[in-house]
Design a protein with these regions (language model features):
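Solvent-exposed, acidic/polar segments of extracytosolic/periplasmic ligand-binding ectodomains
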Residues: 35-76, 80, 431-542
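Extracellular/periplasmic Venus flytrap/periplasmic-binding protein
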Residues: 150-153, 202-331
């Protein structure tokens, strides 16, 4: 995921859990390097030597780096947008009216409880990380540009505007509010040679780990059985599999799934692999999905499909899965729906918007963690409030994802900051720990260390009548994923061989009362932070 981020819907960034392994730990730091894991790094007061990470109240804290003297030579202007004292970041923001009306990106002003602005969120999330991260004598400085529109022409024009400012990195917050930016914009910025940007992750790359996970799990547990979790018209039939997936040049590579599925005796029925197109303009997506829904569902139904392996996405601006499930009900067809973890079908908040008659037959793999009573599952909010407290500052998980990536690259690249060292640092950035029952992924920590990255998932089914906070983000409502085996998570190669007890409430958990003790971080004090009496004021107060 070469310096990429998820550029779809609600960008909730989570970093997953495996033991921290820092190559060359406890070695001598090399001149010009960050000295990640060196003896010098582990000896710093900012470092917790037991974890090898800085004392940041977040399970995705970066690895410790070596000491830095304020008057040391960092190389000065090592790259475009970089000087001895600063790193230039240009941020594309949506028009203010769209920013305030959107819930994509989850922007919230803690002082008012209302939607906040992207600009304020960037500055306030920046303050959280600037407090604890090592940036080698440089300060990250932001310049904001308002997006001119959402269509391809506007995206290309905005890319020209921001790249002309010669930044080290460009952040796209406009896409969260469907107020501009997006795939075309991000690709154009990367093509212009901005050091800290590569093209956004394609649907093909994003979905490969999901395809392999689903192929193994469904191959082991579902192939050869009856569609017992479907509606009355299919539940006594042998399973017949069909696929829904995003097509086109930048779409999903279906062969990854079909070849892996075949290893377990699985196959997609003839004519039952149906693709749909996704316009680059988010404002055009809803109409496009509606136009494609009827023939798409009819094709699956006519092929005798009992079990839909659903790689379609879901979001607030455009909801492919919501559109397709509503069409299935209108055609009086109630198959099993396989939850693949395709963004963001496995988030309670979005799944509540699907046709509930259909989604009551949904089960499969969920990446997001169960809700924890009191909102403790939201590690990003907990980190934000560790610094700002609970009554000030503008917080956004989506904006945090962009700023977090920037700081991780800058800190672990070391003083010699270039596009290549930034890229290499993100490639080496370790997958991160905690997150309830061994949540594992390296999709969001930078570049995966292999062409197809790790992605651990829990097994769950949809309970349309359950109430409570959404998994991961806590938004209350009706409808929740029920997790099997206490929320245990599996990596590829480790999925159970036998069919698990889906749709059995007695063997499922909807949420945790508290974070498991083994997944707690710290606690670490936040010294001189607004939450502990520091004088920093949030951006919205200026």
């Amino acid at each position: 995921m070469a310096r990429r981020h998820w550029a779809a819907g609600l960008a909730v960034v989570l970093v997953g859990a495996v033991a921290l392994v820092i190559p060359g730990a406890a070695h001598a730091a090399q001149p010009g390097s960050a000295g990640v894991g060196s003896k010098d790094a582990l000896a710093q007061s900012s470092c917790d030597p037991e974890t090898g990470r800085i004392r940041l109240q977040f399970y995705g804290a970066p690895p410790c780096v070596r000491a830095w003297e304020d008057d040391a030579d960092n190389g000065g202007a090592t790259a475009q947008g970089v000087t001895r004292d600063s790193i230039k970041a240009v941020v594309l923001v949506p028009p203010e009216d769209k920013d305030k009306s959107s819930t994509n990106g989850g922007i919230k002003n803690q002082a008012t409880g209302a939607n906040g602005l992207s600009k304020d969120a960037v500055l306030d999330e920046n303050a959280v990380l600037a407090h604890s991260y090592q940036t080698w004598g440089r300060t990250i400085e932001y310049e904001f540009v308002e997006a001119s529109g959402t269509d391809e022409t506007a995206q290309r024009a905005d890319a020209v505007t921001v790249t002309a400012k010669k930044p080290f990195v460009v952040l796209d917050t406009a896409t969260f509010a469907s107020g501009g930016g997006g795939q075309v914009f991000q690709q154009a910025v990367a093509a212009a040679g901005v050091p800290g940007n590569d093209p956004p992750m394609s649907a093909s790359d994003l979905l490969k780990p999901l395809e392999l996970n689903i192929a193994e799990w469904a191959g082991k547990e579902l192939v050869g059985g009856k569609a017992k979790f479907g509606g009355d018209d299919v539940k006594n039939e042998q399973r017949v599999f069909g696929d829904i997936y995003p097509g086109g040049a930048d779409g999903m590579d279906l062969d990854v799934f079909t070849k892996a599925f075949a290893k377990y005796g699985g196959k997609v029925a003839p004519g039952a692999a149906v693709s749909y197109s996704v316009p680059t303009d988010p404002q055009a997506q809803t109409a496009a999905f509606q136009e494609q829904a009827s023939p798409l569902i009819a094709k699956l139904k006519n092929a005798g499909v009992t079990t839909v392996v659903n790689f379609a996405g879901a979001g607030l601006t455009a909801n492919a899965t919501g559109t397709f499930t509503k069409q299935a009900t209108s055609q009086d067809w109630f198959p099993e729906w396989i939850v693949t973890g395709s963004p963001y079908n496995d988030l309670d908040f979005f799944a509540r918007s699907f046709d509930q008659e259909q989604w009551s037959h949904a089960f499969g793999q969920v990446w997001f963690t169960p809700y924890v009573a009191g909102g403790a599952s939201d590690a990003l909010t907990a980190l934000f409030q560790w610094y700002w407290g609970k009554s000030q500052g503008t917080h956004s998980p989506g904006v945090f994802s962009l700023v977090y990536r920037l700081y991780n690259g800058v800190m672990t690249a070391g003083p010699n900051l270039t596009g290549k060292t930034f890229d290499a640092a993100l490639r080496k950035f370790p997958a991160s720990g905690g997150a309830f029952q061994d949540m594992i992924t390296n999709l969001e920590t930078g570049i995966p260390p292999a062409p197809i990255p790790l992605r651990g998932t829990a097994l769950a089914w949809w309970d349309p009548d359950a109430t409570g906070g959404s998994n991961q983000i806590g938004i209350p409502g009706t409808g929740k994923y029920a997790y099997l085996n206490g929320g245990k998570r599996y990596l590829r190669g480790k999925y159970p061989d036998e069919l698990q007890p889906f749709f059995d409430p007695a063997k499922s958990v909807l949420q945790f009362d508290a974070i498991p003790a083994q997944d707690l971080v710290g606690p670490y004090p936040c010294v001189d932070c607004p939450s502990t009496g520091g004088s920093q004021s949030p951006a919205s107060a200026s």
